[in-house]
C-alpha cells in the first residue's frame, strides 16, 4: 500500500504543478472553456481528489469480520479504458489515471480527436512521475491517433471502461459487453421552493453555468420555480 500511495502522490503532485500550462493548452487546442477555471479543475482533479482517496486501503485485506470468519481482499481489475471528452480533457485524464494507480490497474487513455495533445501531455506528465516513483513503464499508456474504430476495439478488449463523453460514446461503452462506468450529457434540474434563499440560489446557478463556460456536465440545465415562489 505504501508503494502504491507514493506513486499516486508523485503523479498527482507532478501534474498539479503543471496545471496552468495544461489549462492553457486545453483551451487553445479545443477552443472551449476559460483558462483560469480549467486551472481550478486541474488542481481539483489532482490535489483534491488525491487527498480525498489517499487514506483508502486498496491493497491486501481491506475488511475483516472475525465473527463471520470472512475477509475482503482488494485485487486489481486489469486494464482500464479511459474515454476522455473534449470539454474537460486534462482534468478528466488526471483523475482517471489516479483512480487506476490507486487501485493497481493499468490504464489506456483514449483522447477526444479535438483534444489529443493536451490529453496526452497530462498523461505523459503523470506517467513520467509515476515511473520515477517505481511504476512499471507500460502501466499508463494512450492512443496517439484516436478514432471510433480504435475505441470500439479497445472497449471490447479491456477489463473495465470509464467513459466520459457524448450520449453515443457512453451508449457504445455500455453496449460493448465490457463492464463500464459512464458519464454522459447532464440534464441537471434546479428546483427553487419556499425554503430557498433566492439570492444565494440565483448566484449559485449563475456561477455554476458560467464556470468554464458551462463545460461541466453537472451544471444546471433547467430551473423549476414553484408558483408559490415565482413573482
What are the residue ranges of the model-derived segments?
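Aldehyde/semialdehyde dehydrogenase
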Residues: 5-13, 20, 24, 147-160, ...
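ALDH superfamily catalytic-core signature
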Residues: 94, 102, 170-231
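Solvent-exposed alpha-helices and their adjacent loops that cap or buttress functional pockets
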Residues: 70-77, 100-101, 132-136, 152-156, ...
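Conserved small-residue-rich beta-alpha loop and adjacent elements
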Residues: 54-129, 133, 176-178, 187, ...
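N-terminal Rossmann-like NAD(P)+-binding subdomain of aldehyde/semialdehyde dehydrogenases
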Residues: 1-70
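A structured beta-alpha segment of the ubiquitous adenosine-cofactor-binding alpha/beta core
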Residues: 59-72, 140-158
Amino acid at each position: 500500500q505504501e508503494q502504491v500511495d507514493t506513486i499516486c502522490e508523485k503523479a498527482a503532485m507532478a501534474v498539479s504543478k503543471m496545471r496552468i500550462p495544461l489549462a492553457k493548452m486545453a483551451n487553445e487546442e479545443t477552443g472551449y472553456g476559460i483558462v483560469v477555471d480549467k486551472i481550478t479543475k486541474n488542481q481539483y482533479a489532482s490535489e483534491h481528489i488525491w487527498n480525498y482517496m489517499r487514506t483508502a486501503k486498496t491493497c491486501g485485506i481491506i475488511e475483516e469480520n472475525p465473527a463471520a470468519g470472512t475477509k475482503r481482499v482488494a485485487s486489481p481489475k486489469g486494464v482500464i479504458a479511459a474515454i476522455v471528452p473534449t470539454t474537460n480533457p486534462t482534468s478528466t485524464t488526471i483523475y482517471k489515471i489516479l483512480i487506476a494507480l490507486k487501485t493497481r490497474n493499468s490504464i489506456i487513455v483514449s483522447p477526444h480527436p479535438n483534444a489529443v495533445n493536451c490529453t496526452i501531455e497530462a498523461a505523459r506528465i503523470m506517467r513520467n512521475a509515476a515511473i520515477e516513483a517505481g511504476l512499471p513503464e507500460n502501466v499508463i499508456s494512450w492512443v496517439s491517433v484516436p478514432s471510433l474504430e480504435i475505441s470500439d476495439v479497445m472497449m471490447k478488449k479491456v477489463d473495465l471502461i470509464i467513459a466520459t463523453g457524448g450520449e453515443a460514446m457512453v451508449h457504445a461503452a455500455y453496449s460493448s459487453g465490457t463492464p463500464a462506468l459512464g458519464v454522459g450529457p447532464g440534464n441537471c434540474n434546479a428546483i427553487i421552493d419556499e425554503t430557498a434563499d433566492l439570492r444565494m440560489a440565483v448566484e449559485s446557478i449563475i456561477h455554476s453555468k458560467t464556470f468554464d463556460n458551462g463545460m461541466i456536465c453537472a451544471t444546471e440545465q433547467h430551473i423549476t420555480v414553484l408558483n408559490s415562489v415565482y413573482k
